[in-house]
Amino acid sequence: MKLQKPKGTQDILPGDAAKWQYVESVARDTFSQYNYGEIRTPMFEHYEVISRSVGDTTDIVTKEMYDFYDKGDRHITLRPEGTAPVVRSYVENKLFAPEVQKPVKLYYIGSMFRYERPQAGRLREFHQIGVECFGAANPATDVETIAMAYHLFEKLGIKDVTLHLNSLGSPESRSAYRQALIDYLTPMRDQLSKDSQRRLDENPLRVLDSKEKEDKLAVEKAPSILDYLDEESQAHFEAVKAMLEALDIPYVIDTNMVRGLDYYNHTIFEFITSVEGSDLTICAGGRYDSLVGYFGGPETPGFGFGLGLERLLMVIEKQGITLPIETEMDVYLAVLGDGANSKALELVQAIRRQGFTAERDYLGRKIKAQFKSADTFKAKLVMTLGESEVEAGKAVIKNNRSRQEVEVSFEDMMTNFANISEQLLS
């Protein structure tokens, strides 16, 4: 019997959850500045939603998806990424309709699932923040979305982030490059890893994405996709680069970057940082102008990105960034005797309803243990409430640092705690 969490998952306990909540709140605030609204899609989708969009030959579909047949014999998969479900929702809910303001800007935050070998920053259930922008082919959309991710990293204080940029061009450009890559790699097929030998037949661009040493060696002198861009694709990419420079966002061109999903065209990008000497991708995305059409909607340009929360938080920790998380409690009530139990509950509830954080003792402990709890909670104020205080209708509240104290009536506590707090903490 297994009564532990499944391999590749984690429990996020309150101290850590506060960090998660902070990063999520900064992301929400940043996205709202760019007029993005939140979308929430199911954690599981029909298998075809993912296989059609991500690509039947990708590692995600062939190796990593959690898929099963439900009791109605429907082929279901836990979502391995966020874009396909959002595109499905965009089409199903007819967000392409003329009355819907364009571009449609959406963001999501949630769990994704992939059956991978668990390692630092990579779990089988992982959490992703992502954005999708529908309806604008303008290269300024590409740059605005990239700039939004860059803005988020700045707000979080993340340093040493490098933007890696490439273009996959139009479908025609990509097709021409695909053939050139096949011609280049076929003579050295036996030098490739087993996975890349398969990729050469199914999706040769994925060989460029391989992390295997023999594959990296094989593609060192591979032709560049930028040499196969048609005139329109070149113009789009040049505009993207010019606008990034206008916004003072530095970048490097990475012609071996192809992204692991089949739906991309034109601009693709990754933000990479160094963690303990190793490069780590913390955000990636690009343009996908055919995906809405794959789902039965009208041809609609799209651009988006996803970033892993686990990786982002790991980078924040490794870079020694202190997140401004409020951990102090406003007031702690030490309770002495059964006769004070009911009044303590009444007072602590009244204080909370005035907007303050408050806790009280429920365990009937000795006063010294209760004061220790107040220190653990970093309580700014401490009040001791016993039967004599209940009879008198008032109690002493003290500043837990300066030890300054004041005697206050219960009526004042229940109606005007802000003044009491200000008097003791100023």
From Swiss-Prot:
Gene Ontology terms: cellular component: cytoplasm
InterPro entries cross-referenced by the UniProt entry:
aa-tRNA-synth_II, aa-tRNA-synth_II/BPL/LPL, Anticodon-bd, Anticodon-bd_dom_sf, His-tRNA-ligase, HisRS-like_core, HisRS/HisZ, HisRS_anticodon
Instruction: List locations, semicolon-separated.
Output: Cytoplasm
Reactions this protein catalyses: tRNA(His) + L-histidine + ATP = L-histidyl-tRNA(His) + AMP + diphosphate + H(+)
Is Flavoprotein one of the keywords? no
PROSITE patterns for this protein? AA_TRNA_LIGASE_II
Keywords assigned: Aminoacyl-tRNA synthetase, ATP-binding, Cytoplasm, Ligase, Nucleotide-binding, Protein biosynthesis
Q: According to its UniProt record, what is one Pfam family this protein matches?
A: tRNA-synt_His
UniProt entry tagged with the keyword Iron: no
Q: What class of enzyme is it?
A: ligase
- Enzyme Commission number: 6.1.1.21
Query: What Gene Ontology terms describe what this protein does at the molecular function level?
Result: ATP binding; catalytic activity, acting on a protein; histidine-tRNA ligase activity; transferase activity
Q: Name one GO biological process term.
A: histidyl-tRNA aminoacylation
**In which broad location class does this protein mainly occur, judging by the first location in its UniProt entry?**
cytoplasm
Q: How does it assemble?
A: Homodimer.
User: Which family is this sequence assigned to?
Assistant: Belongs to the class-II aminoacyl-tRNA synthetase family.
Question: What name does this protein carry?
Answer: Histidine--tRNA ligase
Q: Which organism is it from?
A: Streptococcus pyogenes serotype M3 (strain ATCC BAA-595 / MGAS315)
Kindly list the organism's lineage: Bacteria, Bacillati, Bacillota, Bacilli, Lactobacillales
